[in-house]
Swiss-Prot record:
PANTHER family per the UniProt record, alphabetical: 30S RIBOSOMAL PROTEIN S10 FAMILY MEMBER (PTHR11700)
SUPFAM superfamilies given in the database record: Ribosomal protein S10
Organism of derivation: Staphylococcus carnosus (strain TM300)
Name recorded for this polypeptide: Small ribosomal subunit protein uS10
Example of a GO biological process term: translation
Keywords: Ribonucleoprotein, Ribosomal protein
Domain of life per record: Bacteria
Pfam family of the protein (one): Ribosomal_S10
Function recorded in the entry: Involved in the binding of tRNA to the ribosomes.
Disulfide feature: none
InterPro entries linked: Ribosomal_uS10, Ribosomal_uS10_CS, Ribosomal_uS10_dom, Ribosomal_uS10_dom_sf
Length: 102
């Protein structure tokens, strides 16, 4: 018999917010009696944008901005119906993107 698994993937720009959310999810899943592996830190995506500071000329004067996307992976093995209900009722911060695969 194959084991059921819920895979939760979190994305956020702030690493503190994503770590707090991951801890809430792990704590909730463990309280409901499921096995948890994670949070596993995935590679951080870094996007760099270079913009010319001046409006018309002066191409040598540029400014660079970067945007970092932090990611975490959590696997919940053998979830119970109580686990799924607890995860559905969980309130997480607005800056966290959540993908759930069954």
């Amino acid at each position: 018999m194959a084991k059921q698994k819920i895979r939760i993937r979190l994305k956020a720009y702030d690493h503190r917010v994503i770590d707090q959310s991951a801890e809430k999810i792990v704590e909730t899943a463990k309280r409901s009696g499921a096995e948890v592996s994670g949070p596993i830190p995935l590679p951080t995506e870094k996007s760099v944008y270079t913009i010319i500071r001046a409006v018309h000329k002066y191409k040598d004067s540029r400014e660079q901005f970067e945007q970092r996307t932090h990611k975490r992976l959590i696997d919940i093995v053998n979830p119970t119906p109580k686990t799924v209900d607890a995860l559905m009722g969980l309130n997480l911060p607005s800056g966290v993107d959540i993908e759930i695969k069954l």
